[in-house]
A protein has these predicted regions:
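Terminal processing/anchoring signals of secreted or surface-associated proteins
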Residues: 1, 20-22, 51, 116, ...
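Conserved, well-structured interaction surfaces
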Residues: 45, 53-58, 82-158, 172-185
Length: 186
């Protein structure tokens, strides 16, 4: 009898746990999907903060302030672990095979530009009443300023880079390099 109760209880738990479809279809709260994001003003503010956060990544927060060490305004004497590639660049030892400084600027700038474009596109489509027209204009102005900031670094470091004007997908991700004038005007 006791054995039958255990089997019945196990079967009930087994079938009860697998019958709930909603149980397995939850969106993770730490990384919401596009279908549940962009529903309210705080989502747009979070996305804008995420775009600003690119400016606090290693290359922008640690290496960029040390670029005076590449001029006659300062001297770079610290190890690579302290200030990234500034000493290597100052000594003229940076090669294309080294990662870090060169690739981080490129990647982080385009990460920021991608976030800007996604935010601008979603803001353009948003019809909620919790964001006023003035707030939309202000957010768009911040997006354009951030995009200009990222392109200014790309221009300073690379001159001719792809100019991205919208979110990219698999069909549009291979963009040609733009001329220096196009990058500068962006």
């Amino acid at each position: 009898m006791k054995k039958n109760i255990h089997i019945l209880l196990a079967a009930t738990l087994l079938f009860g746990a697998t019958s709930c479809e909603d149980f397995l279809q939850k969106d993770p709260p730490s990384s919401p999907s596009q279908s549940v994001f962009w529903q309210k003003k705080s989502d747009f503010e979070s996305a804008l903060a995420g775009t600003y956060s690119v400016m606090y990544s290693g290359v922008f927060s640690q290496i960029m302030p040390c670029l005076d060490g590449l001029t006659d305004n300062a001297i770079v004497q610290h190890s690579e672990g302290t200030y990234g590639w500034a000493k290597t660049i100052a000594q003229g030892d940076l090669t294309p095979n080294q990662g870090g400084f060169v690739t981080d600027i490129y990647g982080n700038c385009y990460k920021g530009i991608a976030r800007v474009h996604i935010l601008m596109e979603q803001l353009d489509q948003y019809t909620g009443s919790d964001i006023s027209a003035d707030e939309k204009k202000f957010m768009l102005a911040q997006c354009k300023a951030l995009r200009g900031y990222f392109y200014s670094w790309l221009y300073q470091c690379y001159k001719e880079v792809p100019v991205v004007t919208q979110s990219l997908d698999l069909n549009t991700m291979n963009q040609p390099k733009a001329t220096r004038a196009e990058v500068l005007n962006r």
